[in-house]
């Protein structure tokens, strides 16, 4: 079970959004590399990064900030936002990103996901961000007419490393993860699922470690870490204890 600390990038800064709204961004750190270093020092073992500007632009925008983080941490980093073609996938993996997350293109161009996953086994994940049950695209600015489960099932035998499932309605609001929808997705597909959106407290970490969540690979923590509602040491100690049991 992995707890991924999140760094969302906007204008080269580390921010958190509310419900994916770029107009409701709170800056938490002007220096993403310093934030990444801090997460590493706290004991986290895998970093989750999103290029928010890239998600809207359809191409990498905060490359300089991402590269600055790669220089200061040795832990693996997964990256999403603006990854819409094979060249971008190849470019990020060559620069040291451990796993790329394909979101909009997974809906618009499923062949890209399959091609990338085949070429780079274990290094391609799919990001499914749902609003009212339907997957949103283009940096959450548009809603599609397909469900997360429908998209996930397209990639069952494609070699996708993980699915990051985000409930947009809860993202950045500290309302708790949508366990019902997340676990239902995890039980319906063989691809490992990572919970995202709304992680609020140590109670969510405990839920992550409960038997009903045993098909999940982990969860992403954002605002709860930044505003002190989740103590990294307590959360990681719980996970370590569960791993040792």
Curated annotation (Swiss-Prot):
GO terms for biological process: L-histidine biosynthetic process; L-tryptophan biosynthetic process. GO terms for molecular function: 1-(5-phosphoribosyl)-5-[(5-phosphoribosylamino)methylideneamino]imidazole-4-carboxamide isomerase activity. The active site is at residues 8, 129. Keywords: Amino-acid biosynthesis, Cytoplasm, Histidine biosynthesis, Isomerase. The keyword Isomerase applies. Pathway: Amino-acid biosynthesis; L-histidine biosynthesis; L-histidine from 5-phospho-alpha-D-ribose 1-diphosphate: step 4/9. InterPro entries: Aldolase_TIM (IPR013785), His_biosynth (IPR006062), HisA_bact_arch (IPR006063), Isoase_HisA-like (IPR044524), Isoase_HisA-like_bact (IPR023016), RibuloseP-bd_barrel (IPR011060). It is found in: Cytoplasm. It catalyses: 1-(5-phospho-beta-D-ribosyl)-5-[(5-phospho-beta-D-ribosylamino)methylideneamino]imidazole-4-carboxamide = 5-[(5-phospho-1-deoxy-D-ribulos-1-ylimino)methylamino]-1-(5-phospho-beta-D-ribosyl)imidazole-4-carboxamide. GO terms for cellular component: cytoplasm. It is an enzyme of class 5 (isomerase). Belongs to the HisA/HisF family. This is 1-(5-phosphoribosyl)-5-[(5-phosphoribosylamino)methylideneamino] imidazole-4-carboxamide isomerase. It comes from Rhodopseudomonas palustris (strain BisB5). The gene is hisA.
